[in-house]
Structures are given as C-alpha cells and as structure tokens.
Amino acid sequence: MNALVTGVSRRIGIGFAIAERLRADGANVFTHGWTPHDAAQDWGADDLEADVEADFAEPDAPARVVVAARAKLGPLDTLVVNHARSGDGRLADLTAEHIDAFLHENVRASLLLVKEFAQQFEGDRGAIVLMTSGAHLAPMPTEVAYGVSKGALAIAVATLADELSDRCIRVNAVNPGPTDTGWGLADVDPARRMPFGRWGEPDDAARLVAWLCSDDGRWVSGQVLDSEGGFRRW
C-alpha cells in the first residue's frame, strides 16, 4: 500500500494517528502538513515535520502534493483526506472571505486531491477516505462554515464512489466524533455525554480508517461512517 495522508502536523492529532496506524499495517505513507495553520490556532503547532508542507488555500497545492507523494512512493493506491480548516464562528460573524476560506480548503482542495489521485492511479484496487464531521447529524453551534464544508464532503461520497467504482477505487467518509486532540473539550463532562466515559482518542478514528483502506474493507464503498462512541448530543 502506498498512501498519502493529508493534515499530519501534530503528534496528538488524528492525521498522525492515521499515518502511524497505516505504517504499522505495513503501508508506505507520505504525509502532508501545514504548520502555519496550527501555529495560528489555540492549540498551536509542534515540531512534527511532514513529508511536504502545502497551503490548500492555493488552487494548485493538491496537485503539487500528489505529485510529491508519487515521486517518493511510486503510484499511490490509498488517499486519506484528513486536513481541515478549523476555527469558526457564529452566523453573525461570517464574512464572504471567511466562508470562502473554509470552502476552498475543506471542499475544493479535497475534491482536487481526489481528482489528482484518481488520475495517477494505476492499480486494480484503491481506497479513498474523506474525514467529515457530525454536521449531518445535529447542529454544530459556532461552526457554521466548518459544518457546511464538512457536510459537503459527506454528500459528495456517494457520487465520488459511483464515478470511481469502475476503476475499483472505493470512496468512504469517517466522522470521528468528539476526539481529544488536546483542546476544546475540557469544559464538557464526558461521563454525561459519552456512554464509555471518555472522549474519542485519535487512534479510535485511525483504526477505522485503516480498516477501510485495507483488504478487509474491500466491500464497503459510498458510506459515511459515524465513529462517535455513542456520543449523546442532547
């Protein structure tokens, strides 16, 4: 397996857990990150170095990342689109520029990554996993633009899976649910919201993604899988 994983810039993040899980399963993994985004957020960046740094706000960045991954690994057969622009606000705070930033980085870049991956694909069996959110399940207060952008990916899965099925490329999406990546959950009691008494961990999502990318998941395509540990929203 030759896999490209985007959004790998923090050791405590889901992207890093996915890359490590795929490597443990024997895959060759090429990672993408964009440190300036994390550095500008409350959680900050760490010293993790991805194989390539690229800003998906730039229209040509997806093509450059796929080319770089193929140059190092050879033809790619697995793509995990994990990157995301985060840090949203309420409806009253939205601007056109704010909305565009989320759509460009979370939707446009993701679709272009899928396109570039499919164009270079040469194998007889491939897998793509998009990372979405719980926006299709319930309201996400203060995350309007983020929720819309992630919801778009969930909606796109069925169409992408259909278009790529004749080439034996499966497409699925994973909603990892509330996951402890070091920020944002301290003021909510997991004992009340989570039946198992804890928040999700990055490896919880990584195990599901790795399964979807493996031969064991070969009969699953066009699905949005909610891996939330029974999260109670209300």
Located regions from the model:
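Canonical Rossmann dinucleotide-binding motif of NAD(H)/NADP(H)-dependent dehydrogenases/reductases
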Residues: 1-30
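Alpha-helical segment proximal to the catalytic Tyr-Lys
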Residues: 119, 162-166, 218
